[in-house]
Amino acid sequence: MELKVWVDGVQRIVCGVTEVTTCQEVVIALAQAIGRTGRYTLIEKWRDTERHLAPHENPIISLNKWGQYASDVQLILRRTGPSLSERPTSDSVARIPERTLYRQSLPPLAKLRPQIDKSIKRREPKRKSLTFTGGAKGLMDIFGKGKETEFKQKVLNNCKTTADELKKLIRLQTEKLQSIEKQLESNEIEIRFWEQKYNSNLEEEIVRLEQKIKRNDVEIEEEEFWENELQIEQENEKQLKDQLQEIRQKITECENKLKDYLAQIRTMESGLEAEKLQREVQEAQVNEEEVKGKIGKVKGEIDIQGQQSLRLENGIKAVERSLGQATKRLQDKEQELEQLTKELRQVNLQQFIQQTGTKVTVLPAEPIEIEASHADIEREAPFQSGSLKRPGSSRQLPSNLRILQNPISSGFNPEGIYV
């Protein structure tokens, strides 16, 4: 896999990078490519945000954490100072990197590194910067130059170095390297112990913390929402208070106006009552004469209405006599209609027998229905006294009695024929 790193404004590509490749190995490969020694730091930049990567961090894993924003993240190699063994005169002789795209593979150190289980990763001390002394050297060379720097400088600056001093220096370096190796072994054992102890709970803790972060984000969003709602409600409350104050002022003004109007009404009522009493006294005198005249008129009207009532009674009696005669004629017509209906039934029966040749039993009309029809006629006959309206007959005679010759069933007894 390829990793793009910006070095002095030039984009360089490091090949052979995997998820277990550390930032220290990437820095060493780039330092070899540009041919400069010194102290370097690998920076992860996204927009205006920068983060220094530790030597033991994996740049591929760090980029994968950005998700969809990984393409916007830049890795920058920045030189923060000279190396420990770099002479002061070497600063003036610095190579200028070429402004071209350069590919550099990882040094053999990454290939020869022993295979370790991914679940047990070595945690080195967190440092914000890296020191490179030219080439991919072993751990003994990197960590063995701490305390002998002053002594080595004195030995190198002294032109009269003897063999004993060189042997002494070599012996000191060997002893120091052995002690560092022992310390490294003990540190590695301790690191593996603590990693095995806490690695099982680490993922659960990470998941728990991520869930807690999500819950906190949701709570923060809810708090922001309710804060906005609170501000809106406070503004509404302020507006309502102002409106309430205005309404109270208007109510006070209306009450004052109402009191003034009530006082004016009382004065007007007192004046109206005085005028009313005065008019009543005047009208009482005038009304006596008018009442006498009206009484005379009423008596005359009563006499006239009495005469009219006599004439109406005579007319009512004449109408009743004519109504009785009409009722009698109507009864005669009803009887004639019943007789014709019976004859029509006989004719229909004879036609039915001639057409079908079946025996037919003829049932006579029920007397109850005939009596009910006569009762209806008698019920319609009486005339209400005092009314000039003539009650209409509930039966209507056919205009042409020849219509009865058609074979139809009688309305008095629709079920009178049984076959």
From Swiss-Prot:
Gene3D superfamilies noted in UniProt: Phosphatidylinositol 3-kinase Catalytic Subunit, Chain A, domain 1 (3.10.20.90)
Tree of life domain: Eukaryota
Keywords: Chromosomal rearrangement, Phosphoprotein
PROSITE patterns tied to this protein: RA
Tissue note: Widely expressed as a 6.2 kb transcript. A 2.2 kb alternatively spliced transcript is expressed exclusively in testis.
Disulfide bridge positions per record: none
Gene Ontology biological-process annotations: signal transduction
Domain Ras-associating per the UniProt entry, residue ranges: 1-82
Disease affiliated with this protein: A chromosomal aberration involving RASSF8 is found in a complex type of synpolydactyly referred to as 3/3-prime/4 synpolydactyly associated with metacarpal and metatarsal synostoses. Reciprocal translocation t(12;22)(p11.2;q13.3) with FBLN1.
Name of the protein: Ras association domain-containing protein 8
UniProt organism field: Homo sapiens
Classification of source organism: Eukaryota, Metazoa, Chordata, Craniata, Vertebrata
